[in-house]
Swiss-Prot record:
Its main location: cytoplasm. GO terms for molecular function: ATP binding; single-stranded DNA binding. This is DNA replication and repair protein RecF. Belongs to the RecF family. NCBIfam families: recf (TIGR00611). ATP binds at G30, S31, N32, G33, L34, G35, K36, T37. The gene is recF.
């Protein structure tokens, strides 16, 4: 797939911008602070309804405006799609597909697929577990747009369950036993929580299995192959310890093979685990088990990548993760034109010459590649293509 037109209204620094794009390589050259990253950020938002730079939508709306508008004309296999997202300051965001009536913004997820490489990707290796969980969830959302609804439902149930546990914490501090009403209510929320948690865990485990061989292959191609990149999903179900026979049975037997467990089996695991740690959860006032507390452990050779990888190795691991997600999306047979758009935002300036050349060679064959760079010398020769200058007066072709 590729984007042939991108239009912005009141997005970031742009009051208005209209940009024609081509298949193949498109390179945006401009000094820092002039808005080249804003252009690819808009494309990323059109694909994922999120920004790689900020967690809230507010900064995306130009100062003084009430809303921002992103429009894109997408060619996907034999289809041509007109996509539009309206980012609002004071009401829910909306979207349009082929200029039809407005729909929930979530309805456009999965139509445009992008894989974005950015300096922030170092947090995939060096950052907290939430960054790696989000990496899996973002890929799942691209592969299966309905996953966004599952994740939203899980977060809603988690919030409700935490509120209930906090209300019970006061009774615990005063040494009062939980009331019958609390126990009956928490059991209902346990069931809701376990159902959603099991589906979320199962989806993450499956997509990680798809990623593992691609991660390893990409890392070998980026480096001299002296170390092996590995990944392991550590579920909070793996490690909970309790005296009950049921809990011990789960910990010692099936938790080691969660990948092959059914959603129904995982649901039962969660219910038993929640029952086993209920008193601790009441004392803490929060949910101690669930996908929101899981970790994806990255290994490099015999050591964890986090804390042990050098700066260059950290970059190679981060690039391998992004390349692996590209390969998984490209191999998806569910849609026509699955090849995602690759976006490399100020990445080459961060890499040594060897990694620059290898990465450029690996992405050059994609259907569309968008690159941002401060100067021409930052762009490897392997990525020859259209040059677009971004300056204080606008966006123009070379």
């Amino acid at each position: 797939m590729y984007l042939e037109q991108l239009s912005l209204t009141d997005f970031r620094s742009y009051q208005q911008a209209d940009l024609g794009l081509e298949p193949g390589v498109n390179v945006f050259i401009g000094s820092n602070g002039l808005g080249k990253t804003n252009l690819v950020e808009a494309l990323g938002y059109l694909a994922s309804l999120s920004s790689h730079r900020v967690s809230q939508d507010g900064p995306l709306i130009r100062f003084g405006a009430e809303q921002a508008l992103i429009r894109g004309n997408l060619v996907r296999g034999t289809q041509r799609l007109g996509l539009e997202v309206e980012i609002n300051a004071s009401r829910a965001n909306r979207a349009r597909i082929n200029r039809a009536n407005p729909v929930r913004a979530r309805e456009i997820l999965g139509l445009c697929r992008t894989v974005l490489f950015a300096p922030e990707d170092l947090s995939l290796v060096k950052g907290d577990p939430g960054n790696r969980r989000r990496f899996l969830d973002d890929l799942l959302q691209s592969l299966h747009p309905r996953f966004a609804g599952l994740r939203a439902d899980y977060e809603r149930v988690l919030k409700q369950r935490n509120a209930l546990l906090k209300s019970a914490r006061g009774h615990s501090r005063s040494r009062q036993a939980p009331s019958a009403d609390f126990l009956s209510t928490i059991e209902v929320w346990d069931q809701h929580f376990a159902n959603h948690a099991a589906q979320l865990l199962s989806a993450r485990l499956k997509v990680l299995e798809q990623l593992k061989p691609e991660m390893s292959r990409a890392y070998q191609e980026l480096t001299d192959g002296s170390k092996e990149l590995s990944a392991r999903y550590r579920s909070s179900l793996d490690g909970y310890q309790e005296d009950s026979d049921d809990a011990a049975e789960i910990h010692d037997d099936e938790a080691a093979s969660l990948v092959s467990a059914s959603v129904e089996s995982l649901t039962e695991h969660y219910l038993l685990a929640l029952a086993a740690v209920r008193q601790r959860e009441i004392e803490r006032g929060l949910t101690l088990i669930g996908p929101h507390r899981d970790e994806v452990e990255l290994g490099l050779g015999q050591a964890p990548a986090r804390g042990y990888a050098s700066h260059g190795e950290t970059w190679s691991v981060a690039l391998a993760l992004r390349l692996a997600s590209y390969y998984v999306l490209k191999a998806d047979q569910e849609i026509d034109g699955a090849d995602p758009i690759l976006v490399l935002d100020d990445v080459f300036a961060e890499l040594d010459s060897s990694r620059r050349s290898k990465l450029a060679h690996m992405v050059a064959g994609a259907e569309q590649v968008l690159v941002t760079a401060a100067v021409d010398d930052d762009v490897p020769a392997e990525l020859s293509g259209r040059r677009i200058r971004v300056s204080a007066i606008g966006v123009v072709d070379d």
